[in-house]
Amino acid sequence: MKKYLVTGAAGFIGANFVKYILKKWNNEVEIIILDDLTYAGNLMTIKDEIEQDNVTFIKGDIGNRELVTDIIATHNPHYIVNFAAESHVDRSITNPRLFLETNILGTQNLLDCARNAWFEGKDANGKNIYKEGHKFLQISTDEVYGSLAKDFDSAQPLLVTDDVKQVIEGRDNLKTFGTQFFTESTPLAPRSPYSAAKTGADLITLAYHETYGMPINITRCSNNYGPYHFPEKLIPLIIKNILEGKNLPVYGQGENVRDWLYVEDHAKAIDMVLHNGKVGEVYNIGGFNEEQNIDIVKTVISIIARIMREEPQYQALLTCKVEDINEGLITFVTDRPGHDMRYAIDPTKIAVELGWYPETPFSIGIEKTIRWYLDNQEWVKSVTSGDYQKYYEQMYHNRQ
């Protein structure tokens, strides 16, 4: 039985990964969840999973050396998958120290505890030997690469290599807003305290591989969307505000471009890297879904308005009239400091080496996401506490 220590699994991507692994492997795996349950982590997200006999939940900080050492000694996980991180750019601007402590020092503590537990001696050449079948996977972001140019005002056809065409199985109508893309060899150039902290975590992970020979991988993903996304992020924030009849805040003119990846596709990629990724390698995970922020907002407005008209049972969720759900709700607010113009991942490496591709087109994934939020308002209410309301006012009220 393979054992996974998954940190930050009460958060968005970590929770979806745990759900994916349990669905795929059922009782053939054991999962230990370590989560400090900060603002973006909520036990309701994994309430069904932690009731299973093969799942153990532990509340705690990844920076707690004694706790992490004890967990690894007790459970002897084959894989450590580190999702635990402070992960919102706006919050990093107001409190950068917290991001450095959690994202860099917390990651280093996990690495050190794993290194001590998995070390088995040295080979004839003096190289460290670690327990067979063990691996540390650092979950990172495309934001470590900085910003790309937006070369086109409107989307243009995205051309992919013949190798990738053989993998993506019929995904067509791919588009792009630029001529350059992040690859695994793109120089790291973070532009916010959040991305700088994630860069530091990546570098210390790579250093543990180069210095100590630790078995590691790093994955860097584009923007995720899907169920259980905390409502400070763009898509769930827009959904929530539409239902509440609030304005829809959009930074600048909404021209910034992101590559959107459905979270279940991301979970599948992580699983493939864990089992088949070459030790020491970095893998970019992208969605082939470049969209401008303003177009995301308009799409969400259009879908919710259609659902409300065609399926009136959902109108009970509204605090406004159906006819008020329109683009007039959009409010352009002062742009974020250092707002990166465009992110775009080139996932050729993981496609060619591991056979992974993002199966979910944005047109399908966004409707699934919206319907999940409409059907799970109890979860939304459970995570939007008074602290969330104070944060929302701080971020958007004075920027209009």
What do the PLM-derived regions correspond to, one by one?
Residues M1-N224, E264, L274, M341-R342, ...:
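N-terminal Rossmann-like NAD(P)+-binding domain of SDR-like oxidoreductases, especially those catalyzing
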Residues G226, F230, D259-Y262:
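Active-site helix-initiating loop/hinge in glycosyltransferases
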Residues N16-Y20, W25, I31, G60-G63, ...:
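C-terminal substrate-binding subdomain of Rossmann-fold SDR/epimerase-dehydratase oxidoreductases
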Residues G8, F12, K135, S192, ...:
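Amphipathic alpha-helical recognition patches that constitute DNA-binding helices
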Residues E49, D151-D153, P231-I239:
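A glycine/serine/threonine-rich, flexible loop-to-helix segment
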Residues L37, L98, N223-G226, N256-V257, ...:
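Short histidine/acidic/glycine/proline-rich micro-motifs that form metal-
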